[in-house]
Amino acid sequence: MNYDKARILQDVRTVIDQNQTESGIGGVATDADTLELDDIISKNITTAARHILLNCQLRMVSNDGVKDLPKTQKIEASIEGETANPGGVVVPPIATEINITADSLNKAVMTLPDDYLRLVIAEMEGWDCPVRVPTEDTGVARMVCGSRFRGVRPNNHRPCVIEGQQDGKPALFLYGADEGKGITQAQYLPVPKFDIEDKINLPEMLYDAIIYQTAAMTLQTLGSQLWATLAQMAERLSGIEEIRELQQRAKQKGV
């Protein structure tokens, strides 16, 4: 959903005013000139939005805040199975900046647009299920995905997606790709930014979290001790707090 900068400024100021009044903390923000306060808020909006979008629960991301990657491209490369020698380059059937290549490791490489921030979902034809959370790009992951043995590396029953770099550009490595198969669905969260009309596209369910995170960063800049409370509220509204609690429990159990 598109939001005007003027509305965001107003909503952030409202959150700051309400919370300073309820907490009984002195008006650090109200002591600042209105224009100065708006300037500080403006500088923090996209940074706050980026933080929330990178760390939020994906179930809170709706279609109004995501972008589609092309779904009609086909993998037209020779998949040789057990050998590890790369082969084949794809010629996309449509004009696009997204290029796909495939090699003999049943891997498709999709170079990504400059505004790519976070994967929402990726799925290729023949996969039993889509991938929503990329595997961390580690040496172990690369070793498994790059194994010359077909039974070890990912396949269409257990696909894997790794975010990495290809020729200095961000790319998705989709393991479990088959010859002649294309992308059935692929969506990503773009880097949040304002357009020439001072509008910004944000997921509606995350709007309040972004407002609170912006307010928190603004108060931190102004030296108010209230910023931590608002930051905690932002994490609660976006599901980040829940994610951290689950991670902590898993760590305690040694998972």
How would you label these PLM feature ranges?
Residues 1-255:
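Glycine-enriched, solvent-exposed interface loops adjoining structured elements
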